[in-house]
Curated annotation (Swiss-Prot):
The keyword Magnesium applies. Mg(2+) binds at D251, E277, E306. Disruption phenotype: Cells are unable to grow on D-galacturonate. This is L-galactonate dehydratase. It comes from Hypocrea jecorina. Divalent metal ions. Magnesium seems to be the preferred ion.
Length: 450
């Protein structure tokens, strides 16, 4: 790897007006504008590093401001020194003695960290001419473990245990890499038909289309009312059937108390969902445990993680047996490094990884992480959410074929956005360039659509 120095950075506030057609609508977030708090690391080479954090509109500018503070700590640093001891670099980035006060390791500052750390990985991958997943797949167990800051999680897993676990997976790794290169490492599931704001006709149409496209796992948003959800799940089962190998999942996006979640899901149990996602507050470890215990006799699992702020919270969810499914988020956690730590804990305690991927840029990110989990860590096929929106704005968008993610082969982390898309949807943007300066944007800007 030739010597590369980070010379500067930029953040960009990019917002797509998805609230206009209710894409992404759920019981908690009725009308979000899918957004990227975007980070670009500039260098003295031909390469730049691109990372982003997903939000749903207002407040995206706050994350961009935080990105500037975190990225400033990289200015003047040589890439080779940053990646030589990734665990040390990660701790350096989270340990600014003043910035950590507004975390620590959670909230806006941690969202910003995710964007910046992922931009470093993107830059590193480009200099090596590899996709991010392949960098990790080519690591030795010791190199993988050196990417992680084990502070706060050694009661769950030690570096020595992690190396031993990864070494056990080495035997079949070459075969799994070959499967990845044949696009058979990451089966996809779809949420495209399940948004809460969609009408019956649109829901039926999208279910039929995704079924015909090879999907066998389908997620539906719930939490509006029991009656309406029973009607919508009835529509889903009418099309998918109960005994055709089609799996149904439901997602409440945190709207219920613990007793409400238990009662509500008992009333939906006849539709045989695999799991209920985010049934209550994402911070309530004991609440998730109570819900899981209550729903186990009904064959319904509990999934959460898209709002889980760091590896410490995941440690608690996993070690207490509060979840059946671990839903890592590529940029709510502190980038690739913290995800690698959670993959190890999930493997040790037998909890499958099903990443959160319902947002702009998230499928592009998580296809790498699910591939890493299968090839390097768990050795077991899982599924990964795919939301078929906004991929046209990326240089190397994620692609689904025959129900599988097509494993990325281009160098980088797949979230580099087209310059024209960033210009068109930058907020507040330049007059005559940004969509947000047009009359079309007024219903959102005036609060009529949100």
């Amino acid at each position: 790897m030739s010597e590369v120095t980070i010379t500067g950075f930029r953040s960009r506030d990019v917002r797509f007006p998805t609230s206009l057609d209710k894409t992404g609508s759920d019981a908690m977030n009725a009308a979000g504008d899918y957004s990227a708090a975007y980070c670009i690391l500039e260098t003295d080479s031909a390469h730049s590093g691109h990372g982003m954090t997903f939000t749903i509109g207002r407040g995206n500018d706050i994350v961009c401001a935080a990105i500037n503070h975190v990225a400033d700590r990289l200015k003047g640093k040589k890439l080779s020194s940053l990646v030589a001891d990734w665990g040390k670099t990660w701790r350096y980035l989270v340990n600014d003695s003043q910035l950590r006060w507004i975390g620590p390791e959670k909230g806006v500052i941690h969202l910003a960290l995710g964007a910046v750390v992922n931009a470093v990985w993107d830059l590193w991958a480009k200099t090596l001419n590899k996709p991010v997943w392949r960098i990790v797949a080519d690591m030795t167990p010791e190199e993988y473990v050196r990417c992680i800051d084990f502070r706060y999680i050694t009661d769950a897993i030690t570096p020595e245990e992690a190396v031993a676990m990864l070494r056990e997976q080495e035997a079949g790794k070459a075969k799994r890499i070959e499967e990845a290169l044949q696009n058979r490492a990451v089966p996809a599931y779809t949420t495209s038909a399940g948004w809460l704001g969609y009408g019956e006709d649109k829901m039926k149409q999208l279910l039929r289309e995704t079924l015909a496209a090879g999907y066998r796992h389908f997620k539906v948003k719930v939490g509006g009312s029991v009656e309406e959800d029973r009607r919508r799940l009835g529509i889903a089962r009418e099309i998918l059937g109960f005994d055709k190998g089609n799996v149904l999942m439901v997602d409440a996006n945190q709207v219920w108390s613990v007793p409400e979640a238990i009662d509500y899901m008992k009333q939906l149990s006849e539709y045989k969902p695999w799991f209920i996602e985010e049934p209550t507050s994402p911070d309530d470890i004991m609440g998730h445990k109570a819900i899981r215990d209550a729903l186990k006799p009904y064959g319904i699992g509990v999934a959460t993680g898209e709002m889980c702020q760091n590896r410490v919270m995941f440690k608690q969810l996993i070690m207490t047996g509060a979840i059946d499914i671990c839903q890592i988020d590529a940029c709510r956690l502190g980038g690739v490094n913290e995800v690698l730590a959670v993959l190890l804990m999930a493997k040790k305690y037998g909890v499958p990884i099903v990443p959160h991927s319902g947002g702009v840029g998230l499928p592009e990110y998580t296809q790498h992480l699910s591939t890493i989990d299968y090839v390097v860590v768990s050795g077991k096929l899982s599924v990964l959410e795919f939301v078929d929106h906004l991929h046209e704005h990326f240089l190397h968008p994620s692609v689904i074929k025959d129900g599988y993610y097509q494993t990325p082969t281009e160098a980088g982390y797949s979230v580099e956005m087209k310059p024209e898309s960033m210009d068109k949807y930058e907020y507040p943007g330049k007059k005559g360039v940004s969509w947000w300066t047009t009359d079309e944007a007024l219903p959102i800007l005036n609060g009529e659509k949100i």
